[in-house]
Amino acid sequence: MSDISRRTFVGTTVGTTVGTAIGTALAPATLAAADYRIIDPHVHVWKHDPEFPFAQGQKVPARDATPETLLGLMKSNGVSKTVLIQVIHYRYDNRFLAHTLKQYPKTFKGVCRVDPLDPAAPDHLSQLTEQGFRGVRLSPGSGPVGDWITGPLMPPLWKRCSELKVPMTILAPVVRMPEIAQLMEKLPEMTLVIDHMADCPVDQPQELEKLIALKRFPNVFVKISHTWSLSHQPYPWLDSQELVKRLHATFGPQRLMWATDWPIIESVAKYSQALTVVRDDMKFLNADDKSWMLSKTIERVWPFPA
């Protein structure tokens, strides 16, 4: 497999919870407190449907994670809009996500996947952008199987992404950040979003400096998601909050964004907790910080209509 495959566990860990999470709601008074709309920049959806088959060789998820289930969660938790990320179950077949975007054009935006080992990937990205996608995701793993990130096919793909003015999103371990920086040196104004704090281990905090080094590029953003998966503690995951605190001190709230990573989160925590940990339990954030990290930063990258 050419890219990171950690999400293949979804079929077994999420299957028992996807159908029940919709009941998790927040207090109405809390929902009314914010004067901005909350936007979730990282969610996956899929459905067992012969019209949109899962990719060969991928582990088939036990249950669906449908847009309709997601819409219920969003309503219950006061989330207005969501950015949908192409899930690994379909690999580079983006048709189900394209179908979903056509169904709910005012609520969702989509980030596609292209095959990083295909020389035609830049043209595929152009075609997908014409279809309405607003970004592409690459996921190089930490071992030799992910070394394509340093190969000759990357500069043309990154250049096309920059020309199309759509964000590149990167799922990669923190050890890959220096290689990401080398690609950014050639396109320093390009919009790049690093997923999940580069999954920096909480017991190796010095490794976060590899991610912090990307601060010098003005359009690099970081999702502070995965506090729940990186932590060795129960909610509110104070050990992984320390990573967020350092990123907040260096990047500032204008370049950080929260995310649920639903339904992956349901193997460990609740959809609502991905929101409340930022909104209620990161005590080092003030109200203005939260307005950026829950809303305005995301709109810098993925602007939604009013």
Model-derived segments and spans:
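Hydrophobic packing residues within well-ordered alpha-helices of enzyme cores
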Residues: 97, 180-183, 278
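Short beta-strand segments
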Residues: 84-86, 113, 223-226, 257-259, ...
